[in-house]
Amino acid sequence: MKKLAISVLLVCSILSAQSQTKTSENIVIVTMDGLRWQEIFGGADSLLSTDTAGRYSTTYIKENFWAPTDEDRKRKLMPFFWDELAAKGVILGSRKYGNHFENANPYFFSYPGYNEIFTGYPDTAVNSNDKILNKNENVLEFLNKQQGFKGKVAAFGSWDVFTYILNAKRAGILVNDGFLDVKGTLNDRQKLFNTLQHEMPDLFHGAERLDALTFNMGFEYMKAHKPRVMYFGLGDTDEFAHAGMYDLYLDAARKSDAWIRKLWNYVQSDPFYANKTTLIITTDHGRGEAKEGKWKHHGQETPESKQLWMAAIGPSIKPAGEVKTSGLANQGQIAATIAELLGKTFKTNHTVLPALNFSKP
């Protein structure tokens, strides 16, 4: 607890937060499962880009992602992050500058990570990826109980465990994950995506649909229903990493960056959302180092997979770009941050880690 208190003070000083918060009216959250901080801040890894023993095309990587410097490579991989978000928002987790963003839970895999993100509680009893209904209240559930938010909270995820992580039935929120169809009155694009998800190759054996479907299904829902709190849970990066396909892992990251750009452009152009919406982007866990193939894995056997990153942009966020000051913050601080940016205090019957304070007056 002493370490956490010091960490919170460091983060607050790093980001020069003011004493009074400018709140947002809406929040959009995007997670990219298992995307390493090394790629976010350095682009294609030099050790993996030339590994001819891998299950991927080094020629494709060279043609599409390679550049001589880290700065150029990260911009080729994540152009929205580095051309727009870094200029107008904040990015935490650049370990080369001693800025650390980490799991507080000790497991470093998906269910515990998502539980920590949304409940603010790094519960050691949450220790598997099994389809067990989460007993911990999450911030989406909390917000759905607040005046003006009821029925205006939605989550779309590729992985079919989000229904359990977010405990959709108890929470009373829409959670569309796995291969669930979107229900209700649908436009032609929504009908098409419902059909396509059952006709496209099932690359991940029934547990997860492709992110292109998840994003577009969620995006169409967002445009049609204007939720005040919207979550997109993307998963291709983790699946391709586990398969050892570094080229497709990079491709999935760049496609995610393009979708986030599309999402942000929409948010900034739609009167309901424009200048009233904050976007938060992060990951559930990191991965091992490139050497010895550890990048394919995560968990307690690869302790470096606790190393994460987080980004935010919007009217509540003080622009700081890539934070280059040393400090430590935890994934579990995101839940309280989401609530605080909306002018709420996330209180429940379990511990909630304190909010990050990177807002502007």
Show the residue positions of the predicted features.
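A long, amphipathic alpha-helix that forms part
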Residues: 22, 216, 230, 237-277, ...
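Bacterial Sec-dependent N-terminal signal peptides
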Residues: 1-23
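Histidine-centered active-site microenvironments of extracellular/periplasmic hydrolases
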Residues: 51, 282-313
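His/Asp/Glu-rich, glycine-adjacent segments
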Residues: 104-229, 233-242
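Active-site-proximal N-terminal segment of extracellular/periplasmic enzymes that hydrolyze or transfer
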Residues: 20-90
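Structural recognition of the beta-strand scaffold that forms the well-ordered cores
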Residues: 27-31, 38-39, 92-95, 116-118, ...
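Metal-dependent active-site segment of extracytoplasmic phospho-/sulfohydrolases and closely related
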Residues: 28-29, 37, 257-296, 338
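Non-catalytic, well-ordered alpha-helical segments in soluble enzyme domains
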Residues: 141, 146-147, 325-358
